[in-house]
Amino acid sequence: MEKLLPKAKQAEFHRLKLAKKQQLTKNTFALEFEIPEALKLNYKFEAGQYVTVKYPSKGVVFQNDFSMTSAPYEEKISLGIKINNDASSTQDLFDNIDVGDEVDVSEPKGRFTLVSKPHEFRTIIGFAGGIGITPLISHFKNILHTEPRTRLFMFYGNRKSEEIAFKNEIL
């Protein structure tokens, strides 16, 4: 008989203030949200998780999932976001959100996580393309911070060199 997974609990949203907004390439940008002291426990996360952001675009409220690039020890929520085209809702998000604005952000979720093994010697290889690099940045930052014996290798592809998001962080 199949073992059924428990139903996921409904995501809880909280208003978070945008602390930083940065255009990375023509088609990607990063957002960084402050976590108020009262919500620190709600936003405790593991590297590799994601959040859902609610934002208005063209008269409709969108909900999109974005992987975090921040590591747990940083105590902030940083996201990498791709703009698919000029008419996309993510283009509106970039154009219309400013530092200091508040946005509904879900508590972290997702199971693309790793068990930390700080006392072991191990090698981890990551593969990513385009904006798919975001959860790996979170993982690699966390591993570099907590696992001194772990070796990291990354294979990362993009169509064009000018489309490399987070170039400074990964070089």
Locations of the language-model features?
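A short, basic/flexible loop-to-alpha-helix module at the beginning of a structural domain
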Residues: E107-E120
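Gly/Ser/Thr-rich loops at beta-strand to alpha-helix junctions
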Residues: G48, G130-T134
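Conserved beta-strand elements of the Class I
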Residues: I125-F127
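Short, aromatic/basic amphipathic alpha-helical patches
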Residues: A165-L171
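Ferredoxin-reductase
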Residues: E2-E102, S106, R122, T150, ...
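Conserved S-adenosyl-L-methionine
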Residues: E120-F121, N142-L152
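Histidine-anchored nucleotide/phosphate-binding helix
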Residues: M68, I133-H145
